[in-house]
């Protein structure tokens, strides 16, 4: 009797174990729960091949297009531009803040489109441009706003004249001093020397250092508080460093013309000041003192007034619960009105066609 009971219990346990094993067996199903359908597996195409095989000559990229190494780390290629297709090998232009957006190629995520990262825009001549926006402030140049910085490329590229050194076979080569000048004879033209990039730097001997300094750049803002910079080695180590200073060309108030009172019988008022002193505001911090700066005025004719004399002052700013800091600032002392009118931030004001 005991043997029969033991065999019955053993058979019951084995039967339950087999049922559980069969019930836990995996079934092919789709994400929707339909049994019998296998999951679809996507395999991405391999775009990189090793060892690297690059063309003998580097590609020539159009103006404004970066020459970068491909995503495989092999060859130099022209970076993809906004709206171009991209992948792991064909990367987007990193110098323009571009990235490859694969959201339109789900679920493979193999091919994307170059798009701009979210970033701040640019302000140029009192006009605001969005990040990635292309604009043309000058007939000869096209500009692009990238994360608060402006980069420009020429619209017209002069065709290089044939070199005098390229002679037919069997001919004697031209003397080296005459090679590469072309028909424009740019070396004989003195017009390019009027550009600020070709002017001699201000030089001063100080101990054993020949002090050099570039001109201050135009103010980054045409109204309100801006920044200008220059490069100089006027420091203890006689090293070339970038210096920055604040600049306040004109207030951004629309009632500026009402604040300027031109005397009767005159056509210009070179300078003007605000009715009362006010504190400067910079990066959310305010100056410890109130100032009444001098601004350049206006003319009734087509003349414009620009700074003539200025000096540097030190302004201390206090920040709420974040301490204080000091900045050097341009302080205008006098202005002059002239016919040669240029925008304070016009980077094309000194362009000359060679």
Curated annotation (Swiss-Prot):
It comes from the Eukaryota. It is found in: Secreted; Mitochondrion. GO terms for biological process: negative regulation of angiogenesis; negative regulation of cell population proliferation; regulation of mitochondrial membrane potential; regulation of reactive oxygen species biosynthetic process. Residues 1-23 form the signal peptide. Pfam families: Cys_knot, IGFBP, TSP1_CCN. Residues 44-117 form the IGFBP N-terminal domain. Residues 268-342 form the CTCK domain. Coiled coil: none annotated. Its main location: secreted. Residues 208-253 form the TSP type-1 domain. Glycans are attached at residue 308. Disruption phenotype: Deficient mice are viable and fertile with no obvious abnormalities in size, weight, skeletal development, ossification, or the occurrence of joint disease. Belongs to the CCN family. This is Cellular communication network factor 6. It comes from Mus musculus.
């Amino acid at each position: 009797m005991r043997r029969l009971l033991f065999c019955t219990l053993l058979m019951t346990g084995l039967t339950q174990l087999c049922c559980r094993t069969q019930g836990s067996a995996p079934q092919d199903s789709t994400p929707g729960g339909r049994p019998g359908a296998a999951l679809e597996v996507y395999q991405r195409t391999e775009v990189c091949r090793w060892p690297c095989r690059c063309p003998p000559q580097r590609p020539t990229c159009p103006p404004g297009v970066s020459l970068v190494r491909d995503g495989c780390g092999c060859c130099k290629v022209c970076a993809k531009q906004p709206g171009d297709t991209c992948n792991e090998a064909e990367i987007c232009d990193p110098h323009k803040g571009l990235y490859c957006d694969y959201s339109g190629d789900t679920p493979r995520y193999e091919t994307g489109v170059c798009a701009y990262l979210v970033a701040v825009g640019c302000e140029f001549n009192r006009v605001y441009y969005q990040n990635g926006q292309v604009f043309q402030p000058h007939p000869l140049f096209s500009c692009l706003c990238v994360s608060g910085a402006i980069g420009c490329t020429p619209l017209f590229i002069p065709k290089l004249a044939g070199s005098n050194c390229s002679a037919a076979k069997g001919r004697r080569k031209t003397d080296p001093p005459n090679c590469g000048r072309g028909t424009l004879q740019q070396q004989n033209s003195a017009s390019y020397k009027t550009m600020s990039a070709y002017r001699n730097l201000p030089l001063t001997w100080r101990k054993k250092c020949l002090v050099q300094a570039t001109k201050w750049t135009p103010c980054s803002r045409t109204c309100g508080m801006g920044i200008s910079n220059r490069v100089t080695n006027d420091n203890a180590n006689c090293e070339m460093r970038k210096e920055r200073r604040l600049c306040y060309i004109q207030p951004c108030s629309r009632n500026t013309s009402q604040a300027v009172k031109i005397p009767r019988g005159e056509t210009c008022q070179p300078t003007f000041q605000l009715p009362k002193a006010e504190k400067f505001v910079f990066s959310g911090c305010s100056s410890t003192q109130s100032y009444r700066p001098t601004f350049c005025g206006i003319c009734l004719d087509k003349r414009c007034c620009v700074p003539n004399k200025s000096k540097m002052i030190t302004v201390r700013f206090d920040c709420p619960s974040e301490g204080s800091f000091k900045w050097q600032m341009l302080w205008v002392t006098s202005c002059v009105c002239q016919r040669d009118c240029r925008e304070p931030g016009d980077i094309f004001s000194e362009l000359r066609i060679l």
